[in-house]
Amino acid sequence: MSRIGNNPITVPEGVSIEISDNKIIVKGKLGEIEQEFSDVSVKMNEGVLNVERVSEAKEHKAKHGLYRSLINNMVIGVSEGWTKELELVGVGYRATAQGQKLELALGFSHSVVMSLAQEVKVETVSEKGANPIIKLTSYDKQLVGQVAAKIRSFRKPEPYKGKGIRFVGEQIRRKAGKQA
């Protein structure tokens, strides 16, 4: 069994942490995130954060690792940020970003327009001869992953030609076409 919960979290400079009864607030140069927790205790001393479980019950062991990972993701997010990159594979597939709106041309009769949350920054890269790339950046790992999954769901990669929206580096399982 993994013992991720036992690993201490080192807090980098420029990140401040406030711990109240069952809530932790992490502030950094990129933003501020808060998270409620239960069945664990969080202690801070000398730039190191420790998450300890209240008992050895199975559900407390599970939450121990969960909350340690969530808090670690928050600390990394407010200090460095999280990035997801999506690649548009297909003829005529384009993406343009205007502020907090992302417009996608995905082969439908209409273009797909998606408005993004304030916390997510979007950037599109289109080079001649290469597939367009959408870069999503935020301090909230869960939010950037959720937005990326929503964009990918507009046109999932299909297994025959591989067309669609995929994460950069994602391997698509390809199928052989029918034998004529």
Model-derived regions: residue spans:
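N-terminal intrinsically disordered, cationic/polar leader segments
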Residues: S2-I76, E80-A149, S153-A180
